[in-house]
Design a protein with these regions (language model features):
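Aspartic protease catalytic domain
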Residues: 2-68, 135, 143, 202-206, ...
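Signature of the N-terminal lobe/flap region of pepsin-like aspartyl proteases
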Residues: 68-82, 87-93, 97-98, 104-198, ...
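Short conserved beta-strand and strand-loop elements enriched in small hydrophobics
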Residues: 129-132, 185-193, 241-243, 288, ...
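C-terminal reverse transcriptase regions that engage the nucleic-acid substrate
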Residues: 220-222
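Extended, H/D-rich, highly charged conserved domains that either
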Residues: 236-257
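Flexible, small-/acidic-enriched active-site or ligand-binding loops
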Residues: 251-301
């Protein structure tokens, strides 16, 4: 197995420079400072840029970061995270292609109880803290836009559980973990707001690694009937947003009822009745160094989803090849490094005090251009994108590419919104 390159943190300098590479070929670059991991600054205070008004906001933290509200076991290595990420991406792709079986299959009793819980929890990275019950018991929960039903472990909650076999559920995950329990309802406290009769699962038995740390459960932000967004639609208008921090050493936020009018950059949201949990988006083009890559529009015809739980963005094979080639062309001054897991475009930054990387932008339908920050382009010295096996597989916009951007899910209005530099 190839050794892992020394982890470096790339801190974005506030300026952008236009550098000449090869005659008159001008490309736009981000100028970065390379430093050791130990030099990372921990700042657990609220983001300096306030979220959109009009709703309730709760802090959001990385599961394994120093700002996490719960004790965590040793953080997984990047290679471990990428392996888990492959499983999640493969599951989502299978679900869209109509293949049955695998993670998230649910065994139900006589009456249909919605229990679409998503995939292996090991891929989920971000936490919020809420209160459930009267008086409220604090619950620290993973968030997932690919799951509908929220649930907590029974030992962390004793609520008004419904009775009868019709409310029992069982969920199986791809890693062999199983959770079973009762579908319940109770009061949910979100910051200064409260939601009465919030429905969620109360897990009464678990096997395998259902949760690897002291997290209490999962908050489903998917598009189905039992998700948090749908259950609170009467109060918050079926709109929510989040901002994922640039590193695990700083916080982000989750807002319910985000002000949709404050987002200028928008693109249509695509939905499928066959897979209602997921939020579709149409990626149309990719820009590197300010220049749009020559990728046929048909390459993106399989569509993509926006997902908080998938770590790395998956692109059609042809699109990824064009991105990788253009990025390498702009990084000729740095020696190539050994591939790492799903990353095949890596560089050796040894001895570098500053690093110049080409800008990368994603262009969505309707002309929405989303410029990625440095932490959304480079991860551990590698280009932070991965290729699908072909162009017919679903694309996934992962959470690394969403960092520092407030991403609006205006489910009621049928659109996504993007606001740069929100956390």
């Amino acid at each position: 197995m190839a050794s892992i390159p020394k982890l470096v943190i790339l801190l974005l300098c506030t300026c952008l420079h236009t550098l000449a590479h090869g005659g008159d070929d001008l490309r736009t670059y981000k100028v970065l400072h390379a430093g050791a991991l130990k030099s990372a600054t921990v700042n657990c205070s609220q983001p300096q840029v306030t979220p959109s008004s009009g709703g309730v906001t709760v802090p959001l933290h990385h599961r394994h970061g120093p700002c996490s509200p719960v004790p965590s076991k040793k953080a997984p290595t990047l290679e471990e995270m990428l392996r888990r990420d492959e499983l999640r991406a493969a599951y989502i792709t299978r679900k869209y292609s109509g293949v049955k079986g695998g993670a998230g299959d649910v065994e139900q009793s006589d009456v249909t109880v919605p229990t679409t819980l998503g995939t292996s929890l090991g891929t989920l990275e971000y936490l919020i803290t809420v209160g459930i019950g009267s008086p409220a018991m604090t619950q620290t929960m993973l968030i997932d836009t690919g799951s509908d039903v929220s649930w907590v472990l029974r030992q962390s909650h004793e609520g008004n559980s419904c009775s009868g076999s019709q409310c029992q559920y069982m969920v199986k995950y791809g890693d062999g973990s199983i959770g079973a329990g009762t579908y319940s309802s109770d009061k949910l406290a979100l910051g200064s707001s409260a939601v009465n009769n919030f429905q969620f699962g109360c897990s009464q038995s678990e096997s395998g690694n259902l949760l690897e740390d002291q997290t209490d459960g999962l908050m489903g932000l998917g598009g189905g009937a039992q998700s948090l967004a749908t259950q609170t639609a009467g109060t918050f208008g079926k709109a929510f947003s989040y901002c994922l921090p640039p590193t695990s050493s700083s916080p982000g936020f989750l807002t319910l009822g985000a002000s949709t009018s404050s987002f200028i950059v928008k693109t249509p949201m695509l939905r499928s009745s066959e897979v209602p949990s997921y939020y579709g988006v149409r990626l149309q083009a990719i820009r590197v160094g300010g220049r749009q890559l020559s990728i046929p529009a048909s390459v993106f015809s399989a569509g993509s989803i926006m997902d908080s739980g998938t770590i790395i963005t998956r692109l059609p094979a042809t699109a990824y090849s064009a991105l990788s080639s253009a990025f390498k062309a702009g990084m000729k001054q740095y020696p190539p490094a050994q591939p790492m897991g799903i990353f095949d475009t890596c560089f050796d930054f040894s001895g570098q005090s500053t690093i110049n990387i080409p800008t990368v932008s994603l262009v969505f339908s309707g002309g929405a251009v989303v410029d990625l920050v440095s932490d959304g382009i480079i991860l551990d010295s590698c280009l932070a994108f991965a290729a699908n096996s072909d162009d017919s597989s679903l694309g996934i916009i992962g959470n690394v590419q969403q960092r520092t951007i407030e991403v609006l899910y205006d489910v009621g209005g049928g659109s996504f919104g993007f606001k740069a530099g929100a956390c």
